[in-house]
UniProtKB/Swiss-Prot annotation:
Entry keyword Cell membrane: no
Record-annotated RRM domain positions: 15-90
Organism of derivation: Rattus norvegicus (Rat)
Entry protein name: RNA-binding protein 43
Superkingdom of origin organism: Eukaryota
Gene that encodes it: Rbm43
Region span, Disordered: 170-200
Annotated InterPro entries: Nucleotide-bd_a/b_plait_sf (IPR012677), RBD_domain_sf (IPR035979), RRM_dom (IPR000504)
Length: 343
C-alpha cells in the first residue's frame, strides 16, 4: 500500500483497486493475463504488498476502467475461488496484524493442531510461531482476518456446546445422587435434576482498532445510550493502534445476558465501520510553522461543515476518518484553504 501512495498523482487512489483471494506465488503478468485480460491494456502498474499474501494493488490508466472493475465486485475464476475486488481507500485498513491468545482453547483443543488447521483454511495469512502462553501473531489482508475470526468463533461455539453438554450431564447426575437427597430437610420436597443457576453475566473483553473505536464513540449517537440502556460499564484501554474494552454488568446480574448482547452489538457496528470508513492522513512534520498554523485554522473552520468526519490532530500529522466522500472533500478543502497543493 505504501508503494501505491508514493505515486505522485492525485488520481492514483481513484484508479487503484485492491484484489484479494489470489493464489499465492502468482506473478504480475499471470495476474493480468489470467484474471484481467480484457482490461490488460489499461493496467498501468501491479503492486504486490510484501506483507500481505494473496493481495495485489492494480493501478489502471483510467478511472472509469477501475470503476467498472469495482462495480463487478467479484471475478469468476472458473473452478477456483472468487476474487474479491474493492476500492483502494474503501476500508480503513487493507493490511491487518493481530495478536491472538489461543490459550482459551487449551482444555479442549491441541493448540498446535488448531494452528495447522487455520493455516490450511486460510493460506493467505502469515502466522508467527506459537508461543508457550498460547499467543500467536497473525498478519494478512482484512478480509482474510475476517475469515480467521469466523473460523475461531465456530471453534469457540463448538467447544462451548461440548462444555454445556458435559455440565448438563454432570448436573443431572448430581441432582439424582441419593446422598444429596437424604441430606435435604425432611419438610422440603426433594427435587431431582435441579440445576445450579447460571452465574450473573461475567465481564466480556473486546479488542478493536483504535481509529474505528474512536469513530464509534465520538461520531455515533447510539454507543453511549446503548451502554446506559443495558446498564453496562465499559472500561477502555487505548494502546496505540489497539483499544481493549472490558464490559461489565453495572447492576450485579439484574440484567442477565446484557453484557454479551452489548458486546455483539459493538462487534457488529465495528465490522460495518471497517468496511465503510476511509482514512486520510495529512502530514505536518517537515512543514513550516506558518503552513501548520494555516492548516490548523482551516481545520477548525471545516469541522462544522463535515460533522461525519472524525478529526484527530497529532503533533506530526492529522487523521481524518469517515465516509469516503466526506473525507475526500474535507482533505481537498483543508489543503486549498491552507494554500497547499492537493495531492
Amino acid at each position: 500500500m505504501a508503494s501505491a501512495l508514493t505515486v505522485k498523482d492525485p488520481t492514483v487512489s481513484e484508479r487503484t483497486v485492491v484484489v484479494s483471494g489470489l493464489p499465492v506465488g502468482l506473478s504480475k503478468d499471470q495476474l493480468v493475463k489470467r484474471y484481467f485480460r480484457d482490461e490488460g491494456g489499461h493496467v498501468e502498474k501491479v503492486i504486490y504488498p510484501p506483507r500481505s499474501k494473496g493481495v495485489a494493488y492494480i493501478i489502471f490508466k483510467e478511472k472509469k476502467v477501475a470503476q467498472t472493475i469495482i462495480r463487478q465486485k467479484k471475478h469468476s475464476l472458473g473452478s477456483e475461488p472468487l476474487l474479491t475486488v474493492s476500492h483502494f481507500s474503501e476500508k480503513v485498513f487493507n493490511y491487518v496484524m493481530a495478536i491472538l491468545d489461543l490459550s482459551v482453547f487449551r482444555p479442549q483443543i491441541v493448540l498446535e493442531s488448531l494452528v495447522v488447521d487455520l493455516k490450511k483454511k486460510i493460506p493467505t495469512l502469515n502466522f508467527s510461531p506459537l508461543g508457550r502462553s498460547g499467543k500467536i501473531s497473525v498478519q494478512g489482508s482484512f478480509l482474510a482476518i475476517l475469515k480467521l475470526k469466523q473460523a475461531l468463533i465456530s471453534k469457540a461455539i463448538s467447544a462451548l456446546e461440548n462444555n454445556r453438554k458435559y455440565a448438563g450431564e454432570r448436573r443431572n447426575w448430581t441432582g439424582q445422587n441419593p446422598r444429596r437427597v437424604l441430606q435435604k430437610n425432611e419438610n422440603s420436597a426433594p427435587t431431582l435434576g435441579t440445576s445450579v443457576p447460571e452465574p450473573a453475566g461475567s465481564p466480556e473483553t473486546l479488542v478493536l482498532d483504535t481509529d474505528v473505536f474512536l469513530y464509534l464513540k465520538h461520531k455515533c449517537q447510539f454507543y453511549e445510550p446503548t451502554l446506559s440502556k443495558y446498564h453496562v460499564l465499559c472500561q477502555e484501554r487505548v494502546d496505540g493502534d489497539i483499544t481493549t474494552l472490558c464490559l461489565q454488568d453495572a447492576r450485579d446480574g439484574s440484567y442477565p445476558g446484557s453484557v454479551r448482547h452489548v458486546k455483539e452489538l459493538i462487534e457488529e457496528w465495528a465490522q460495518e465501520f471497517y468496511l465503510e470508513l476511509r482514512k486520510e492522513l495529512l502530514v505536518l512534520e517537515g512543514r513550516r510553522e506558518s503552513e501548520k498554523r494555516n492548516m490548523r485554522q482551516a481545520f477548525e473552520q471545516l469541522c462544522c461543515r463535515y460533522p461525519r468526519v472524525l478529526m484527530n490532530v497529532h503533533r506530526t500529522h492529522i487523521d481524518l476518518i469517515g465516509p469516503p466522500s466526506d473525507t475526500s472533500l474535507f482533505k481537498t478543502q483543508l489543503m486549498k484553504s491552507a494554500g497547499q497543493k492537493v495531492t
